[in-house]
Amino acid sequence: MPKYQFQVQVQVQPQYLPDQSAPDEGVYSFAYTITITNTGDVTAQLISRHWIISDANGHTEQVKGLGVVGQQPLLKPGEAFQYTSGCRLRTASGSMHGSYFCVAEDGEPFTCPIELFVLEAFSPGQPGQPMAARVLH
């Protein structure tokens, strides 16, 4: 039985960016705001990220890097960190999922999964109407 629990909650709010997109050229821009909350028992630092980004044609891209938006936030139990980033797809819809690699204050490494979320440029059944921002857990 572990002496403490690693637990991080990840909330995602994706948003289509019509002003930065060019659908006629196959460019669809999306922003996503992520809130990472340390719901565990121990202080932890986010070290790196790994994203798998897929479009509707099955094109998949992996993105790996240190930290998020140039930072490696240190989160005490109960603390949250929020950031906004973005990506471009060749299609009007796609998805993202991945993980964060974190290290607890005692040096113990652990991985925080990021569940799949959908990137959708247009509202279903309403072609041409940009998708409203929404929060996913």
From Swiss-Prot:
NCBIfam families associated with the record: PRK05461.1
Organism this protein belongs to: Acidovorax sp. (strain JS42)
Domain ApaG span(s) in chain numbering: 2-126
GO biological process, alphabetically ordered: error-free translesion synthesis
Name of the featured protein: Protein ApaG
Entry superkingdom: Bacteria
PROSITE patterns: APAG
SUPFAM superfamilies: ApaG-like
